[in-house]
Amino acid sequence: SSDVCSSDLNNSTKLAFALLYIGFSTKAFIVPFHPLAADAHGAAPASISVLISGVLTKSGIYGIIRLTYFLFQTMGLGSFQFLLVFVGSVSMFVCVTMALAQHDFKRLLAYHSISQIGYVLTAVGLCTGLGFSAGLYHAMNHTLFKGLLFLAAGAVLYQTGTTDLDELGGLSKKMPWTTGLFLVGAFSISGLPPFNGFASKWMIYQATYEKAAETGNIGFLLVTVIALVTSVLTLASFVKVSQSVFFGRLPAKFENVTEVRPGMIIAMCIFAVLCVATGLFPSFVTRFVTEPAARAAFSVVQYIDAMMGTGYAATVMGEDLPIVATVSFTQVGYWSPVSWLLVLCITLLAVTIVAVSARYDCVSQSRGEAVEAKYDLFFGGEESVYSQVGGGDLFWGFKHNWRHYFDFMHRLHSGVVNDYALWAAVALSLAIVFIQIVL
């Protein structure tokens, strides 16, 4: 692996770096600018949400990459990686927990989008060849599976007129194509093999672990744990969405809902096929896409020559050519996706057998709140041998145990623009102080 080299920066350069970093962070919607993403996606049409998630947020990450690896690479940013990794890890965890608490389909996807951007920022911030390659791979994968998920949410909104998770349910009976394609996106973002999210997340886990082994810094092991926990919570969140939107009881008002037009299905199919293909053939992606980009990122000379022509950097810079360490990619692009697919199929088969053999008979008698209520049902005093999955919040126990954390997050996310402007000012101040002191 390779670390960015170090030298001295003057105060003006540090201030410029801090201002540029905050600007690109705002464009990427990373913490503490994440509430902007939820509002933007909530108001935008599904097709625009695909562009916001797939292009706009990536432009912020691209700016940070250019800032870190090209503009300031030879000016001493070795310590800056800790800020990027910290902010990326916080974005991962905070936004996935915010997603768990959402009751709107598109706002939930918006918070997941920023959580996945946290993965990308963390990987890029490691300043290693493997980490950079993993970050680019996950950025590409995020564009694919999040585009698919937003199109699925748009299909649901188009046919039902709502994205309220508490009003939806049972749509798999009416929209089987949308349901199946949504599940492909859900499995991909959750990091399940053989979909693309597993491949890129596995690279990120490996990159953070190797960084910890190389530096002896136990903090990078904590980052690995945070990334793994975030994946588990992501899967939990999409289990919630699946049972709230596509499974369970179909409300009477949606009895006449039909599948979306073929053109909308084809668009989702394209994303779904790419999610599977980039997961089954990760070595192709790393060899021809991410590895060349990573090599260019760690060599300013190579990047300049790629943009301006071979030999241009040597002609213009002469003896001032920057020297960076070589990058090792010995373990990039090696997986056995077929083996992991076999393990997944066996596990799913075992779970299905257990679930079918342990099913219960349904009883209709219930006291307290209506069975249709999807939140805090069991406070209503319901007494029955069996209750519908769609009738309760699957993760109420988790949220109850974390109630103080969620109450704190609820108070922070007040919805008042002035509060969010204060967050931006505080973030800018902290970035300036960190860069002035540490770099």
Where are these regions (language model features)?
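Transmembrane-helix bundle segments that line or gate the permeation/cavity pathway
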Residues: 27, 231-241, 245, 275, ...
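Soluble mature domains adjacent to a membrane tether on cell-surface and organelle-surface proteins
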Residues: 251-259, 266, 278
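Transmembrane helix-loop junctions and nearby membrane-interface residues
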Residues: 99-100, 127, 242-245, 276-283, ...
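Aromatic-capped, Gly/Pro-kinked transmembrane alpha-helices
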Residues: 284-439
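Hydrophobic core segments of alpha-helical transmembrane domains in multi-pass membrane transport
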Residues: 18-24, 92-96, 185-189, 227-231, ...
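Alpha-helical transmembrane segments and their helix-start/interface "positive-inside/aromatic belt" motifs
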Residues: 174-182, 258-273, 419-424
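Hydrophobic transmembrane alpha-helices and their helix-loop junctions in integral membrane proteins
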Residues: 2-253, 260
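Hydrophobic alpha-helical membrane-insertion segments
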Residues: 182-193, 267-295, 430-431
